[in-house]
Amino acid sequence: MSNPFAGNTDPISNALIPMVVEQTAKGERSYDIYSRLLKERVIFLTGPVEDHVANVIAAQLLFLESESPEKDIFIYINSPGGSISAGMAIYDTMQFIKPDVSTVCMGMAASMGAFLLASGAPGKRHCLPNAKVMIHQPLGGFQGQASDFEIHAKEILATKHRMNELLAFHTGKDIEIIAQDTDRDNFMRASEAVEYGIVDSVLTHRK
């Protein structure tokens, strides 16, 4: 099972990833901690949502589906958000596969991180007690010819509307309320995220 952080060439970051050694019939086998947790159907979304992160998470989701289509998958999220297209690649894969995907926010789920948190299976979306959630409208920047600005402005507005539609679906809120509440950065504590419908419960202890 490959290391989901294999693309990280930072020696300091790599040195901080613990290794787990297991005894097998064929002798010792070592895993980095993330690969070992993947065997337990646990995926981590940490840091910015970027294309290479989305590719790894989508691959992990598809792999776990092929292993056991009936067993839940768990995604732990601690992310400031990031690329909309990368986030939508993760979102679409979560909705496409057969297993329920349970989402858990630890630390912070902001922007696309909050969107993915809300898109977990109904009844299986959670926050840890001191986690925070932040929602806002998509951010866009463009440099180029003046004639192209209108094209990109229309695309940003269309993306904003689509994400508001999906967030309204997953939270049960009216789209008008979502549009109003995401007009500026909107921070929520764990209990407020439950009230808003982004998550279903706050987890304090494992049952």
UniProtKB/Swiss-Prot annotation:
Its main location: cytoplasm. The keyword S-adenosyl-L-methionine does not apply. One of its GO terms (molecular function) is ATPase binding. It catalyses: Hydrolysis of proteins to small peptides in the presence of ATP and magnesium. alpha-casein is the usual test substrate. In the absence of ATP, only oligopeptides shorter than five residues are hydrolyzed (such as succinyl-Leu-Tyr-|-NHMec, and Leu-Tyr-Leu-|-Tyr-Trp, in which cleavage of the -Tyr-|-Leu- and -Tyr-|-Trp bonds also occurs). Keywords: Cytoplasm, Hydrolase, Protease, Serine protease. One of its GO terms (biological process) is protein quality control for misfolded or incompletely synthesized proteins. It comes from the Bacteria. Its EC number is 3.4.21.92. GO terms for cellular component: cytoplasm; endopeptidase Clp complex. It is found in: Cytoplasm. The active site is at S111 (nucleophile), H136. SUPFAM superfamilies: ClpP/crotonase. Cleaves peptides in various proteins in a process that requires ATP hydrolysis. Has a chymotrypsin-like activity. Plays a major role in the degradation of misfolded proteins. Belongs to the peptidase S14 family. Fourteen ClpP subunits assemble into 2 heptameric rings which stack back to back to give a disk-like structure with a central cavity, resembling the structure of eukaryotic proteasomes. This is ATP-dependent Clp protease proteolytic subunit. It comes from Psychromonas ingrahamii (strain DSM 17664 / CCUG 51855 / 37).
